[in-house]
Amino acid sequence: MHLAGAVNRIRKFDGPVRVYVENRARPDRGAQVSQVVEDIRARIQHLDITMTENAAEANVVVTLVRDRDLPRAINKIYGPDRAQLIQRSLVPQCLASFRKDESFRITRSDVIVVADAGDFIFYDCVYEELLQALGPINDTSLVPWTMFNDNVQMGFFDIYDQYILNVLYDPRVQPGMDSDEVRAVLPQIMPTVRAWVARINDLDQ
């Protein structure tokens, strides 16, 4: 699940991304979040993302909670009015949101993940919500092979989504661009992205 308002411009981080885990759950899955962040770092060519142990340095905060404590965590992060709306319209096990400035640069993302719902759901949630927190937050049911389709559960960072994130974080795609501006630069971007994704996944080009 995502919370970011209308989607009509490119939103992305325009600098280093530092991820902090606030653990309120058992089992403690902080090490697994670190593994996911490292995997994302290795697969997105132009993204500087890593963990931090200093909450003040973080611009992405991942809150791990028990399933029974999820409503309380949503209320704390989003406030009572918005929390009621979230819980009335959805039954989330994980969610992400971000704030952006007037130039559509993401300034902070918040991710909430249930830690005690099993390994597969945990990894599926962490990958999906962390990646959505980086900007591609428009869920769609039209494409069957992406984790950004809420009807699909993967639990890993698949090839198609690697294309999406590598296009988004190519330096030629700037915060605030509209769809026409992005389409105009795609012919220059795609050969680089295809070569990168093929190389890191040992694919034949």
Q: In which residue ranges do the predicted regions lie?
A:
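Surface-exposed acidic, glycine-flexible loop patches that form ligand/cofactor-binding
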Residues: 8-11, 52
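Metzincin-family zinc-dependent endopeptidase catalytic domain
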Residues: 27-143
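Acidic/histidine-rich, surface-exposed loop or edge segments in extracytoplasmic proteins
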Residues: 10-25
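Metalloprotease/metallohydrolase-associated module, dominated by Zn2+-dependent proteases
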Residues: 1-7, 80-121, 137-205
